[in-house]
UniProtKB/Swiss-Prot annotation:
Matching CDD domains: PheRS_alpha_core (cd00496)
Needed cofactors: Mg(2+)
Name recorded for this polypeptide: Phenylalanine--tRNA ligase alpha subunit
Keyword Ligase: yes
Protein species of origin: Stenotrophomonas maltophilia (strain K279a)
Co-factor remark: Binds 2 magnesium ions per tetramer.
InterPro entries: aa-tRNA-synth_II, aa-tRNA-synth_II/BPL/LPL, Phe-tRNA_ligase_II_N, Phe_tRNA_ligase_alpha1_bac, Phenylalanyl-tRNA_Synthase, tRNA-bd_arm
GO molecular function: ATP binding; magnesium ion binding; phenylalanine-tRNA ligase activity; tRNA binding
Enzyme Commission (EC) number: 6.1.1.20
Compartments (UniProt record): Cytoplasm
GO biological process: phenylalanyl-tRNA aminoacylation
Homology family: Belongs to the class-II aminoacyl-tRNA synthetase family. Phe-tRNA synthetase alpha subunit type 1 subfamily.
Residues that coordinate or bind Mg(2+): E252
C-alpha cells in the first residue's frame, strides 16, 4: 500500500486549489469513487498481514473522512462565491433615476360611450347589441320605412350586392330586442353605424346610442323627464332644454332636443343633441306588440356629438386620425 499520509496531503492541496464545482467533482470521483485512490486502498487491506490491517484500516478511514469533509467545505465555499457573483451581477442601483413607463388610456369615444351607457344603466336600461351588417327589414321596413319611402334617402346607406347593408342606425337592435322580450321593457343599443357622409361634423362611421322603453303607461312626459335626467347627469349641470317637433318614421310624435349651450364668448345658443319620440304603432305591430295596450318612447344620440361637447373638440375627424398628440390629452 502506498503512503496514505502523502496521498491525503496531496489530495487536500488539490481540493483547496479547485476553482469550480466541476473540478471538485472530478477530484471526488478520483479519490472516493468506486475506482478512486482511497477506495482502492480499502480494497487492498485483505492483502496485508493480520497484525497490520487494523492500523491501516483506521488510517484509510480517517483519510476518507478528512477528504470527504474537505470536499464538502470546498463545495460550499464555491457555491457561496458563485451566488455572491450572481447577486452582484443582478444588483439594482437604487440611486439611478427611474424610467418613465408608457401610459395607456381609453379613447375619448370609448370614455363617452361608457359614460352614456352607465347613466342609462343606473336608470334601469339593459344594454343590448346587434349585427353591424343588417337586412332591409330590420334597418328600415320594421321601423316604418316601407320600400321607396322618401325618408330612406336621408340615411345615405352603404349597400352590399345581395341587398344587405351596413346599418344606418342602431334601431335594428331595438327591433330584435322587442321580438325577443315581452313588455314591459327598457333597453339601450350602442355601437357603430355607417352613412355615406364625411365633413367636419360627420363621418362615414360613427357611434350611436339609442334607447327604448315600452310599457302600458309611458307618456311623452316620461320621455322628457328621462332625457332631462340624462343630460343633467352627463354634463353634470342643469340646462334649459327645448323639444322641437320633428319627423322620424318610427316615432309619432317625434321631436329633436336642444340645449341652451354657453359659447366661449358668454353668449348662449340652442344646440341640437338628441332625437326622440313616442314609438309609432306600426313599429309595435311589426314586432308583435299590441299598440292598443302598450305605448313606448325611443331616443337616439350621436356619441361623437356628446364627446365633442364634453371635451371641447371642434372637428369630429380628430377622433379617428390616430394622432397620439391629440389622444393622449384624454389618457
Amino acid at each position: 500500500m502506498s503512503d496514505i499520509q502523502s496521498l491525503t496531503t496531496q489530495a487536500l492541496a488539490d481540493v483547496a486549489a479547485a476553482q469550480s464545482p466541476d473540478v471538485l467533482e472530478q477530484l471526488r470521483v478520483a479519490l472516493l469513487g468506486k475506482s478512486g485512490s482511497i477506495t482502492s486502498q480499502l480494497k487492498q487491506l485483505g492483502a496485508l498481514p493480520a497484525d497490520e490491517r487494523k492500523a491501516a484500516g483506521e488510517a484509510i478511514n480517517q483519510a476518507r473522512d478528512v477528504l470527504t469533509r474537505a470536499l464538502g467545505e470546498r463545495k460550499a465555499l464555491l457555491e457561496d462565491a458563485a451566488l455572491d457573483a450572481r447577486l452582484a451581477a443582478e444588483a439594482i442601483d437604487i440611486t439611478l433615476p427611474g424610467r418613465n413607463g408608457d401610459r395607456a388610456g381609453l379613447h375619448p369615444i370609448t370614455r363617452t360611450l361608457e359614460r352614456i351607457t352607465g347613466i342609462f344603466g343606473r336608470l334601469g336600461y339593459e344594454l343590448s347589441e346587434g349585427p353591424e351588417i343588417e337586412d332591409d327589414w330590420h334597418n328600415f321596413e320594421a321601423l316604418n320605412f316601407p320600400p321607396h319611402h322618401p325618408a330612406r334617402a336621408m340615411h345615405d346607406t352603404f349597400y352590399f350586392g345581395d341587398g344587405r347593408l351596413l346599418r344606418t342606425h342602431t334601431s335594428g337592435v331595438q327591433v330584435r330586442y322587442m321580438g325577443d322580450h315581452a313588455p314591459p321593457l327598457r333597453m339601450i343599443a350602442a355601437g357603430k353605424v355607417y352613412r355615406s357622409d364625411s365633413d367636419q361634423t360627420h363621418s362615414p362611421m360613427f357611434h350611436q346610442v339609442e334607447g327604448l322603453l315600452v310599457d302600458e303607461h309611458s307618456t311623452f312626459a316620461d320621455l322628457k323627464g328621462t332625457l332631462a335626467e340624462f343630460v343633467r347627469a352627463f354634463f353634470e349641470r342643469d340646462f334649459e332644454m327645448r323639444f322641437r317637433p320633428s319627423y322620424f318614421p318610427f316615432v309619432e310624435p317625434g321631436a329633436e332636443v336642444d340645449i341652451a349651450w354657453q359659447q366661449p364668448d358668454g353668449s348662449t345658443r340652442w344646440l341640437e343633441v338628441l332625437g326622440c319620440g313616442m314609438v309609432h304603432p306600426n313599429v309595435l305591430r311589426n314586432v308583435g306588440i299590441d299598440p292598443e295596450r302598450y305605448t313606448g318612447f325611443a331616443f337616439g344620440m350621436g356619441v361623437e356629438r356628446f364627446a365633442m361637447l364634453r371635451y371641447g373638440v371642434n372637428d369630429l375627424r380628430a377622433f379617428f386620425e390616430n394622432d397620439v398628440r391629440f389622444l393622449k390629452q384624454f389618457a
